[in-house]
Amino acid sequence: MLHELLLRLRTPAVRDLAWTLLSPPMLGETTQVQRHPLQASCWTRQPQQLADWLAQQDSDASAVHAWLASKPVRRLGLYYERLWQFALHAAPDVEVVAANLPIRQNGQTLGELDLLLRDDEGEHHLELAVKFYLGTDGREAADWLGPGSHDRLDLKLSHLAQHQLPLSSRREARGALHDLQLDETRSAFWLGGYLFYPWPHYSSSPHGATPEHCRGRWLHQRNWSDFASTSPGAHWQPLPRLAWLAPALINAGGVWSDEMLQQWLNTLRPEAQAQLLVRLDEDRAGDWREVERVFLVNDQWPAQS
């Protein structure tokens, strides 16, 4: 359903909203419980209702724009959380009891509970994350690194298991949960995002990856010319970080010329942070749609500070 919706939806925030709600999880097999936040909602049982709601948001995006503007964020993970919060507040059979609830001990914040929900299946503490991991040369979670090479899939899963998910069960959380009339909260997580595979080399998916996970490729700056030559005449351009969720849709006036891309490449520093670029194809309406995405990393990656 997501593919068909993205052919119709045009508002960037609503496209990101649709991707957030409907894209597959990164992992299908996990040691900790993974639960879609809308699992018990009629929007999951009757997806046309969700599609209709998203179409309404696209025709009048004032509500989602107002929601996002009420608490502006610069980090992609927080933007992802805000989109989830907007949808869950609108879902007809899900109650958002609290979001980003701080848990403190002697005045010191131990952490925050991303979401506390109530639905037909009970009370839930959910941790949300969206991640972009680049594979090196193995199937272990430790072989999949964030674009900055500091984050790793195994570290994220460990942090979820050892800190984030148990937080709602700690003694320090009981008072806050009791005040919200939450007594038997079950913890779970939802991990969205993309896995990027090396070019020109090959890498297998990490253990437990969902077969239909969102994916791309990554390459070093030194390999760009060879990579670009595999799709001659293609239109490539970088995306700003907050535009990394849904596949890009760019109108004719926003597409870069070959000269603009070359100028950007010429000014890209050798030690630059990883850049996300998309390859765009023109559709029959004259819009340009993403058909491929790649991370361009510096030639020292992942050995960088």
Describe the function of each predicted region.
Residues 1-305:
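Intrinsically disordered, low-complexity Ser/Thr/Pro/Gly-rich regulatory segments
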